Each structure stands twice: as C-alpha cells, then as structure tokens.
C-alpha cells in the first residue's frame, strides 16, 4: 500500500506491519471494502470519490460473473432476451465449430496467458504484448471462425473490469472465481450461476480478519453502529467522517475535532506494532 494509505490505516486504529528490505506494508485487520478503496478517494470531492468507488464495485462484480451469465442466458434462458439480440448472437456464431463453453474458455485462457506474459516481460514491451497480442489473437480467432466476435468482446470487457480493481492480488482471486462461475453456469444455467454466487457470498460472510468480519461494514452492523457505512460504497463528506472505525473505537472513537468546518487531527501517539 502507499505511505499515505498506511498512515490512514494507523489513524483508523489498524496495525501496520513492515518487513525489512520490503516496500510492502501489511495492514491488519482488513476487509473487502479496503481492497476497493484507494488513497486518492480522500483527496477528491465526495461525488467524484463515490462515483469512482461505485465503478470499482460494479467492475469487480462483473469481472467474475459476466462470462457465466452470458453462457447461462444464451444456452438455457434465451427467452429473457429480446429477439433481435438473440438473432444477433446466433448470426455471430454461424460457422463456429466449438460450443460456447469451449469458446469462452479458449479466449479466457488466452487472455490470462497474455496478461501473465506481459507481467514477466520488461517495461513497455510487456504493455505492448498485452494490448497488441490480445487484438491480434482475437481478430485471428474471429477470422478463422474459431470463436464468435461476441465472445471476444465479452472476454475483453471482462478483462477490462478486472483492471479496474485497485489491488492486483485481490483481482487475481476474482479471476480464479470466474472459471468456477463459468463451469457452473454452463452446467446448470441460471441456477448454477445463482448457486455459485451463493457459495461465494456465504464463504465471504464466514471469513474473519483478526476477529472482525471480512465483509464489514456490510455485515456486523451491531459492531459498527452504522458509522462505518459512511466510508464504504458511498464516501460521505470528510466532515462527516469524524469517528474512527470500530477497530479503534474502544479507547478513542473521535478522529477529528473542532467547531463547524475547522477540523484538525487530534495529537495522539501512534505505536507501530
């Protein structure tokens, strides 16, 4: 995390661990909400920060659900789509020898391979391989009638959504879950899609970080008292964020003090554990 992000975590009552000769700081406890926030959110105004966070949440959800939802709808539940859209999907697939599941898996694995190759290659060459390679492979696959143009657009948009997640490690977990959702949706349709979402949601609700629910502040409202929701998907104005999160609320709940708009940080001793 960035230095200002680590400093903000200390002010919120979290612990920050530093390892010798490493530029990475470990913040505990952490929640899913922290992986979708950036330090820049606190430099921008409320509307801009809230809009950026909303985009990240939507992108994170679509990064692992969009291919599975496409397979469930086009293979099992075509009646929920308008007729012109269904005809466009089937016209795009004319001449493709593989089932839609194989098409999606082929393109997803190709994009994952290009992404991994781009990370390992140095500097500008890695970015060039990721962008140009994706365009060339996608266009070549469409020209050879191996995949439909709809699948190429779908996979490219899914990859774009994963790039919108601030934490690369957090985005990697969504990339893994994406394949599980694809298999379940291709097997059971919309029911498999919902089952996979339910299993993921139950697993996240069961996780804890240092004794605190991983999905705070969306769960555990009895702990947060409704205050931590002000800094979740919607970031309230900074003058409203005067209370520290639940991690430090036992001894000192007030982060800001002052009259009217004259807010300053309290002078407190911060101990780095």
Predicted region positions:
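Hydrophobic alpha-helical transmembrane segments of membrane transport and translocation systems
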Residues: 151, 156-272
């Amino acid at each position: 995390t960035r230095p200002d992000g680590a400093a903000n975590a200390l002010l919120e009552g979290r612990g920050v661990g530093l390892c010798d000769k490493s530029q990475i700081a470990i913040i505990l406890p952490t929640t899913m909400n922290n992986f979708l926030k950036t330090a820049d959110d606190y430099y921008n105004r409320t509307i801009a920060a809230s809009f950026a966070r909303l985009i990240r949440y939507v992108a994170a959800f679509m990064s692992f659900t969009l291919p599975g939802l496409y397979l469930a709808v086009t293979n099992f539940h075509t009646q929920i789509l308008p007729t012109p859209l269904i005809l466009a999907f089937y016209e795009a697939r004319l001449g493709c020898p593989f089932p839609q599941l194989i098409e999606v898996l082929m393109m997803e694995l190709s994009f994952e391979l290009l992404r991994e190759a781009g990370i390992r290659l140095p500097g500008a060459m890695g970015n060039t391989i990721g962008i140009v390679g994706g365009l060339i492979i996608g266009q070549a696959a469409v020209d050879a009638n191996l995949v439909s143009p709809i699948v190429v657009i779908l996979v490219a948009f899914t990859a774009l959504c994963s790039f919108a997640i601030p934490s690369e490690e957090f985005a990697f977990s969504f990339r893994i879950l994406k394949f599980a959702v694809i298999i379940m949706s291709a097997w059971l349709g919309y029911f498999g899609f919902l089952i996979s979402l339910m299993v993921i949601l139950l697993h996240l609700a069961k996780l804890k970080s240092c004794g605190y629910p991983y999905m705070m502040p969306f769960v555990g409202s009895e702990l947060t008292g409704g205050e931590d929701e002000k800094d979740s998907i919607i970031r309230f104005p900074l003058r409203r964020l005067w209370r520290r999160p639940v991690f430090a609320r036992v001894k000192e709940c007030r982060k800001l003090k002052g009259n009217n708009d004259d807010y300053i940080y309290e002078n407190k001793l911060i101990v780095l554990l």
